[in-house]
Regions:
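Helix-loop-helix hairpins in multi-pass membrane proteins, especially solute transporters
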Residues: 94-240, 349
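Cytosolic juxtamembrane N-terminal segment immediately preceding the first transmembrane helix
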Residues: 2-50, 54
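Central mid-sequence intracellular linker of multi-pass
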Residues: 203-248, 267-270, 294-300, 460-494, ...
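Symmetry-related core transmembrane helices of the 12-TM Major Facilitator Superfamily/SLC fold
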Residues: 199-214, 243, 271-278, 521-538
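Small-residue-rich alpha-helical segments with characteristic i,i+4
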Residues: 168, 180-183, 187, 321, ...
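Hydrophobic transmembrane architecture of multi-pass small-molecule transporters
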Residues: 20, 26, 78, 441-532, ...
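Transmembrane core module of solute transporters
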Residues: 38-102, 110-113, 125, 131-134, ...
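Structural signal for alpha-helical transmembrane segments and their membrane-water exit/capping regions
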Residues: 215-217, 254-256, 278-290, 454-459
């Protein structure tokens, strides 16, 4: 007690405090001042190459499933595990990629992911059986899971604040454009070569990415220090197990739920309950743990929490409609898979133009205003879609509707990514990137599952409603049946056959109209949800002007 109260001891304590503060300030300055030795744009293109390839693989295999099933002697239901296995392993790696990058070193982790992705892609192409292909897809998903968050963290450290918007725009082009053109590329490769080449094509691109990453990418000093510090910290095996099992079972439920008719399936119900229990337990455990795998306490940061919410909605809208629109074109309008993919491709190309524009604007105007414009534009485009989605629309109309729908997404993606780093220390960049990528992908999975379910239920409800008006007591219905019967009789059918066929045609038309109304109902609901988000953008804080970069991360 005497030592603490001694005047000299107090003076020494104050000096230590000042010295510690000075060291912390110097470290923050060094973190902010650090820049890689090589051209940042070469680094951006290098890491974007692998990310584009990985995101492309989430959708490129969709159109090849019938060919894969036929080649390997599998049923259509069995072949869907080629997609599910990839998505499940990918979803498990995403939230823990920040922890892995910190323990291994981000560059080493990133290169390991690219190498695993390349090797497993080659093995996918060689797979002699469906079981082997599914196993290789699990490895491929695990390798791909670390690429998106690692790239975003690398870009955040590589670029100064003033240029980060354009860097995130480059990243956005990979994440947003790849799913849009994946089905088209997959269909073209499958039709002209073989389904195996949708996997082989990854190998040379991965090797180029590996070489360029080795030569150009480097870990910042703070990350090297964090890696050394982590060596003495015990691994949170319980948190690791909980998140892996919880996310894995949730992704499995989302991917197979609609196919199994959700809660009418016992195994889906059990898996969903298990995933909820595991994830709730994981959140409680991680929140209290001193050294968690995923630092959930970052959600106390207003900007980051808001960005997570926005990215969840963005994922649901982007990936949900990427599945929804081709489905509508194929099932109701008779498009082939390739033609449906081509209708979406225009949206991908417009995103390639809008992303750089958004990257330029974030440094010129209030990012919150830009996001608000993005939400308002997207909501208006979704509503516009509902007024033009008919069974008689042509290919040009379908393609332009997709262009309108995605044009505003760039104004959401880039500024929300930028603002998510406000008030977050640089050493947490890996965590921010990992959680943003994870929530966007989970939003996509949940969006796809919910939209598909609502369309199925909505079609049934609309069909029941319309059927109530289809009876012989309705003059218009009677007139339609009589007209069709007369037309069919003129083609040589007997009166009874013509009548039966007329009723069958009306029933088919009723089913198509019910489905169309269900699609427009779902898209209208999306438009309302997105429109409500426009004013919420102003919850986020702007980056303070004139402050050093560390406080802006």
């Amino acid at each position: 007690m005497y030592i603490i109260s001694h005047p000299h001891a107090q003076e020494n304590k104050q000096r230590c405090f000042v010295a510690t503060a000075a060291i912390t300030a110097n470290q923050s300055f060094e973190i902010a001042a650090w820049r890689p030795r090589h051209n940042p744009w070469l680094i951006a293109l290098t890491v974007t190459l692998a990310t584009f390839m990985e995101v492309l693989d989430t959708s490129i295999a969709n159109v090849a499933l019938p060919h894969i099933a036929g080649s390997l002697g599998a049923s259509s239901d069995e072949s869907t595990w080629v997609l599910t296995s990839y998505l499940v392993s990918n979803a498990i790696i995403l939230p823990i990629s920040a922890w892995l990058a910190t323990r291994m070193g981000r560059k080493r982790f990133y290169m390991s992911c690219v190498a695993l992705f390349a090797a497993s892609s080659f093995l996918c192409g060689l797979a002699p059986t469906l079981g082997m292909l599914i196993f290789c897809r699990v490895l491929q998903g695990a390798g791909g899971g670390g690429l998106q968050p690692s790239e975003q963290a690398i870009l955040a450290d590589t670029f100064s604040l003033s240029k980060r918007g354009m860097a995130f725009a480059v990243y956005g082009m990979a994440v947003v454009v790849a799913p849009a053109i994946g089905p088209t590329i997959g269909g073209w490769i499958t039709d002209n070569y073989s389904w195996r080449w949708i996997f082989y094509i990854n190998v040379p691109i991965s090797l180029i990415s590996l070489y360029l990453t080795h030569r150009l990418v480097e870990d910042p000093p703070y990350l090297k220090q964090e890696k050394e510090r982590r060596k003495s910290i015990p691994v949170d095996y319980i948190g690791l197990g909980l998140v892996a099992l919880g996310i894995g079972t949730l992704q499995l439920v989302l991917d197979k739920g609609q196919e199994a008719d959700w809660f009418s399936s016992h195994w889906i119900t059990v898996l969903l309950a298990l995933s909820i229990i595991l994830l709730v337990t994981w959140v409680i455990w991680e929140w209290r743990h001193e050294h968690p795998i995923v630092e959930l306490k970052l959600l106390k940061k207003r900007n980051f929490a808001t960005a997570m919410f926005f990215m969840f909605i963005l994922g649901a809208v982007l990936y949900g409609t990427t599945v929804l629109i081709p489905q509508y074109l194929q099932l109701l309008m008779g498009y082939s898979a390739v033609s449906a993919g081509e209708a979406l491709a225009g949206g991908g190309f417009i995103m390639m133009l809008m992303m750089p524009l958004s990257g330029f604007l974030v440094s010129k105007m209030d990012q919150r205003v830009l996001m608000s414009i993005g939400f308002a534009t997207t909501a208006a485009a979704l509503y516009y879609m509902t007024t033009h989605m008919t069974l008689g629309m042509d290919f040009r109309t379908a393609a332009m509707l997709r262009v309108y729908q995605v044009a505003g997404l760039a104004f959401i993606f880039v500024p929300s990514n930028m603002l998510s780093y406000v008030d977050v220390p640089p050493e947490k960049n890996n965590q921010i990137s990992s959680m943003i990528s994870f929530i966007r992908n989970i939003g996509g999975s949940i969006g796809i599952a919910l939209l598909a379910t609502f369309i199925t239920r909505g079609t049934q409800q609309r069909q029941t409603y319309l059927s109530g008006h289809m009876n012989d007591g309705n003059p218009r219905f009677r007139q339609m049946i009589d007209g069709l019967t007369a037309t069919l009789r003129s083609e040589g059918l007997s009166p009874s056959d013509a009548t039966h066929k007329a009723y069958a045609r009306v029933a088919a038309l009723l089913s198509q109209q019910a489905s169309t109304l269900a699609y427009t109902d779902v898209i209208s609901a999306l438009a309302v949800i997105v429109a409500c988000l426009a004013p919420l953008c102003f919850i986020m804080k702007r980056p303070p002007k004139g402050l050093a970069a560390p406080s802006l991360h």
